[in-house]
Amino acid sequence: MSPTSAASNGPSSVKPLTGPQKALHKLGLLRDIDLALHLPLRYEDETRLVKLRDVREGDLAQVEGRVTHAEVKLGGQRQLLVTLDDGTGTCLLRFFSFYPSLQTTLALGKQVRVRGEIRGGFAGLTMMHPVVKPAGGELATALTPVYPSVAGLPQTYLRRAVQAGLQRAELSDTVPPQYLQEIGLQPLWDMRKALSFLHNPTPDVSLAALQDHSHPAWQRLKAEELLAQQLSQLQARRARAQLRAPVLATPALSVPQVSVPNVSPKVWGEAAVAQAAVRDGHLTPLQTLAQRLLVALPFQLTAVQMRVVAEITQDIARPVPMHRLLQGDVGAGKTVVAALAAAVCMDAGWQCALMAPTEILATQHFAKLVGWLHPLGITVAWLTGSQKAKERRDMLALISSGQAELVVGTHALIQDKVQFKALALAIIDEQHRFGVAQRLALRSKMMSQAASQSEPASGVEPHLLMMTATPIPRTLAMSYYADLDVSTIDELPPGRTPIITKVVNEARRDEVIARIRGQIAQGRQIYWVCPLIEESEALDLTNATETHTQLSAALPGVMVGLLHSRMPAAEKQAVMRLFTSGQLGVLVSTTVIEVGVDVPNASLMVIEHAERFGLSQLHQLRGRVGRGAAASACVLLYSTGDAPRLGETARERLRAMAETNDGFEIARRDLEIRGPGEFMGARQSGDAMLRFADVNEDARLLDWARRTAPHMLDQSPALAAQHVQRWLGGKTDFLKA
């Protein structure tokens, strides 16, 4: 089958696919529009010939000349060495891999055309493995595109497939011209003209404008892509508004103004005053579960936390499903906000589920929620994959009967045997750690089981609260999360001591261990984190085990624990109990303690090979300390290995950690370093939404797309649907998760 029939808008052929056709599918090039939108990485200029006297080192040059010398050198590595003379100079052509046919093409006296990068050196001008053709052929009339590809997919085949897809694709304009006129893109560059130009640019165009995507043709595509993103998310938001959800109404969590010594409402907020008033006997609490929980808490909520609680409770009091993201820095107090939302749900006679990505984090949530809610008469169930059969049966019975009003667990919550009686609110912590399929499974389970005595299950969708300790920069919230309502806790609870972060060379490891001795002498505890080596679990385990052995020998009399991903769940829990209770002085761990672990007595975090960690991950790990009143520190141990110095990206990450504790600033810098696609992980394990636009560099176009989407959806719904289908196809499942 030819590349011209490798993709189409219709069903796939039943004939077996060839190697290149399989490669096209691997790239996701299934439709003609996919091929048309598969744009070049770069371009090569085959439209002109240059003279060797005019070239400089580093140039990509195309030269014609005569072969004046050719030999196969049989030294240490077999090479074909050819000298080319164009009358103005000579160039050495060097090939380390070649067939006899190439020797024939480059035989002495042959006239040839070669194209490649000019290099310098003791032999003079050199090309390594240039492209070779017979001389005298017609020159290209457009720049030659070089496309993203995979093994088994030659550029020549891919170019033909793309050109065929471009010819067949339906490329009529889907964006009304009046919208494009606002940004000066109509009628100069319609969709077909823009794509045709980018696949076949004329030789007089600025290569810089093509490479940095500032050319008007690129602007047209980026504007359309951003508009498709905004339309798809607005469609998702409006579709949810048509669904029914349980109404979880409760009296507002506000209290009468009272005066309590040493507690200022301006500083702490009304809720904190009420908490103090109840404890001091000044006020009788309201009798809703949420109010009783609020006043029974052993700490005072901030005004920001209360504002976020109000946003959530207003959402779940409506008959449409909430779809809200709660973001806050490490230790900002998101769990208590979730607990108050759960209390409102349970007050209304419904069940709530909280799903966490790891058993350690789920265990911590369970312990905390039991401590807060059990004294108030609430049954909290616990469900994980490692439970023993009897305990699991007991938990499943509590859940299905409705006796368990709150269920905490891992992905075990989405298994088929788990049957809720009346589930109305799902809370997903560290939602980015779950794949889209897992989040969709929980949502599907919620929809099938959202029922109560007073309301049939059919058509009822539960409320969804997602939480993340990885703050999302504003530009990404406006683009990748435009379908969600976002609540932000942008301040830490009072009493937190800022963490001092030091970047230390591995050569000073003994000094770090000496500092650990000092912390132990003061009764403090220490984390020592080893990097998770994805390529080898065995190497990961060896690394952590060796560090554990070394620290145990260097710290006689100190209990040093070991925690890693390959340990059975029961052993992990036992180690964490020892550390939480203070019996372990040092905990050597891989990144299984990255999120959620809360031990206020831990005051020092040492991260080994910090240069291997991402910036967000480093910040999450640092957040395990600084949770008590004691001064806390984070030591970033780095090693350059065999290199003379750290790479620039690693230096930027470590520098950012040393300069700020602010998670929102960390997120901004992380976005700068990695770019939106990698930062988001394609909306956390979903399909990527932006291939061409950059939400930072294209802020003007993003603002236009945000303003245009609602107008287009209202005034031209058919065109809006066609536009989303063209750009995203079926890649919108994650909007439901």
Question: What are the language-model segments listed below?
Answer:
Residues 1-30:
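Helix-hairpin-helix
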Residues 18-23, 31, 248-257, 273-326:
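Conserved pre-motif I regulatory segment
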Residues 38-68:
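OB-fold nucleic-acid-binding modules
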Residues 57, 73-260, 267-268, 273-296, ...:
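Upstream accessory/linker segments immediately N-terminal to the RecA-like ATPase cores of bacterial MutS
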Residues 89-102, 139-156, 180, 207-217, ...:
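Short hinge/gating elements
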Residues 304-310, 317-655, 665, 707, ...:
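Inter-lobe coupling/hinge segments of SF2-like helicase ATPases
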Residues 633, 641-737:
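C-terminal accessory region of SF2 helicases/translocases
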